[in-house]
């Protein structure tokens, strides 16, 4: 069995994965995902997964061995941020041509490694395998080993050709490369009882820096972050940490489990999205560190910091809650965000009508049920047409998703907030939840949406003509006129007509928007103003009878 095939089989037999553990031996041998034919299009491939997992290491030169399109399509597609070197943003590729494919690209790869060292002198070079050199038999493991000896510098092979499998498999192959070639290869300058690793955190839009000040105040040192704002020397010495927090289990569970197995570093899966989840993660970090020998007063200091930060965050989001209360949100993301962001949205007063679980683990789905109830609407896969219909039918007031589906929301004239890795704002930690609530409020309150929903002038003219003709037809028939009035929908969502609301108010003596929602199909969001007007205009004798 080849080295790549053996590594893939080892990943598929991951004991830390609950889904894998529930399978039979034969099912585990078949693997978690169907391997792809070389060159086939299937969204994010294994190479893309490895690249986005490791590229946030800021001082490393990332060299893609393959055609230039592989590097061009994957460059900077994860909005990570750096506090130091910006070498990671420089695109290096061997740019294989037809001649290289015929005669082999190993010499070209060796030449590229030498050129990078001569010009940039990075502490390490990560070399990524792609489909074409893998198919023609280029041995990047041997080339990297020879280059490391020749230049006395770590040259790490990332053997993750795109046809090996999905983007998620590529994340894990990247983790295996770190375990095999990087982690444990050097010692830290010093250690403390408060050293931790953050695994699967990518510092999107610099959101790690919103959590780091809180950890610094507690005296907790991030020995290594894999891989957001990470440095090569930090990940090489990360085996000396006292505890670890796994931020995105789907991508790096193999790294956390094997570091616990090899170096005795306990880990837990947590999240810094939302107030309650941030607090619980801080408590877990403190508990693990105390169990590993840190002073016991860390627990008390952690609770004091949590109380202060929670009070600040709740006070900051309080002004937004009246405007967000009862608004319905559709969350189209995946992985850890499928449940961690749910908690944050609920804290802001939003109602979740559905969350995507396309890239979520069984543990993620169980957490969603804990937060949203056993009947939670978990969306495994939704086409753009289905998403558009759901938004157009006003089943959600706002959608939070990635850039791929933003145009569906815009076409449906529904507010949209970017929640995926391309986003421009940091939503992690106590300050992050406040920023998320602010962005949601800005999107929902924008006057653009009301203008966008208005019909075009020529459509309005045609509609006016139809209405005039209809009014002329029913002008002489009072019964027909009343029927037409009651059949009118009360707002743009078209969920319920005027007569249904009037009957419900009259028969049941309803006095609030919430009561009307309970007895009818009214959404209560976009319909709220019209329902309030109807309640206020109710005849006084009927109001007194209801009271």
UniProtKB/Swiss-Prot annotation:
UniProt KW keywords: Nitrogen fixation
GO MF term set: nitrogenase activity
InterPro entries, sorted: BFD-like_2Fe2S-bd_dom, BFD-like_2Fe2S-bd_dom_sf, Nase/OxRdtase_comp1, Nase_comp1_CS, NifE, NifE-like
Keyword Metal-binding: no
Pathway named in the protein's UniProt entry: Cofactor biosynthesis; Fe-Mo cofactor biosynthesis
One GO-annotated biological process of the protein: protein-containing complex assembly
NCBIfam families the record matches: nifE
Task of the protein: This protein may play a role in the biosynthesis of the prosthetic group of nitrogenase (FeMo cofactor).
UniProt family annotation: Belongs to the NifD/NifK/NifE/NifN family.
Record's protein name: Nitrogenase iron-molybdenum cofactor biosynthesis protein NifE
Gene source species: Bradyrhizobium diazoefficiens (strain JCM 10833 / BCRC 13528 / IAM 13628 / NBRC 14792 / USDA 110)
């Amino acid at each position: 069995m080849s080295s790549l095939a053996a590594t893939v089989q080892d990943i598929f037999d991951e004991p830390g994965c609950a889904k894998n553990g529930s399978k039979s031996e034969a099912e585990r041998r078949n693997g978690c995902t169907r391997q792809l034919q070389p060159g086939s299009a299937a969204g994010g491939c294994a190479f893309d997964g490895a690249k986005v997992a490791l590229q946030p290491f800021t001082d490393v030169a990332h060299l893609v061995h393959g055609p230039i399109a592989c590097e061009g399509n994957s460059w900077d597609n994860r909005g990570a941020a750096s506090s130091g070197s910006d070498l990671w943003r420089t695109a290096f590729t061997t740019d294989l041509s037809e001649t290289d494919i015929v005669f082999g690209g190993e010499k070209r790869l060796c030449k590229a490694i030498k050129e990078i060292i001569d010009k940039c002198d990075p502490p390490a070079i990560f070399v990524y395998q792609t489909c074409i050199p893998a198919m023609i038999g280029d041995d990047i493991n041997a080339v990297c080993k020879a280059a490391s000896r020749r230049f006395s510098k770590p040259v790490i092979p990332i053997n993750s050709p795109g046809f090996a499998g999905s983007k998620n498999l590529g994340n894990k192959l990247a983790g295996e490369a770190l375990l095999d070639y990087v982690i444990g290869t050097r010692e830290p300058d010093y250690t403390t009882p408060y050293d931790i690793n953050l695994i699967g955190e990518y510092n999107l839009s610099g959101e790690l820096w919103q959590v780091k000040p809180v950890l610094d105040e507690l005296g907790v040192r991030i020995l290594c972050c894999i891989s957001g704002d990470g440095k090569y020397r930090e990940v090489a010495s990360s085996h000396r940490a006292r505890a670890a927090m796994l931020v995105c289990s789907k991508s790096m569970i193999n790294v956390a489990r094997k570091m616990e197995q090899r170096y005795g570093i306990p880990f837990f899966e947590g999240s810094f999205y939302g107030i309650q989840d941030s607090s619980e993660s801080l408590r877990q970090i403190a508990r693990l560190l105390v169990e590993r020998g840190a002073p016991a007063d860390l627990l008390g200091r952690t609770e004091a910091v949590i109380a202060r930060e929670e009070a600040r965050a709740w006070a900051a989001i309080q002004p937004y809650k009246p405007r967000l209360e009862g608004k319905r949100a559709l969350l189209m993301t995946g992985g850890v965000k499928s449940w961690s962001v749910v908690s944050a949205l609920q804290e802001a007063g939003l109602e979740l009508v559905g969350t995507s679980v396309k890239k979520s683990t069984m543990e993620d789905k169980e957490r969603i049920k804990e937060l949203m109830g056993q009947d939670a609407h978990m969306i495994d896969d939704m086409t753009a047409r289905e998403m558009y219909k759901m938004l157009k039918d006003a089943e959600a007031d706002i959608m939070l998703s990635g850039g791929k589906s933003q145009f569906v929301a815009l076409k449906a004239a529904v507010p949209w907030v970017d929640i995926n890795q391309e986003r421009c704002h940091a939503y992690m930690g106590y300050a992050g939840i406040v920023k998320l609530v602010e962005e949601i409020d800005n999107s929902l309150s924008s006057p653009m949406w009301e203008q966008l929903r208005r019909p075009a002038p020529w459509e309005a003219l045609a509609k006016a003509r139809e209405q005039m003709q209809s009014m002329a037809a029913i002008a002489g028939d009072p019964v027909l006129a009343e029927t037409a009035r009651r059949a009118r929908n009360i707002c743009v969502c078209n969920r319920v007509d005027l007569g249904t609301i009037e009957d419900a108010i009259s028969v049941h003596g309803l006095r609030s928007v919430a009561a009307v929602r309970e007895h009818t199909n009214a959404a209560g969001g976009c319909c709220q103003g019209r329902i309030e007007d109807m309640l206020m205009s109710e005849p006084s004798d009927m109001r007194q009878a209801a009271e």
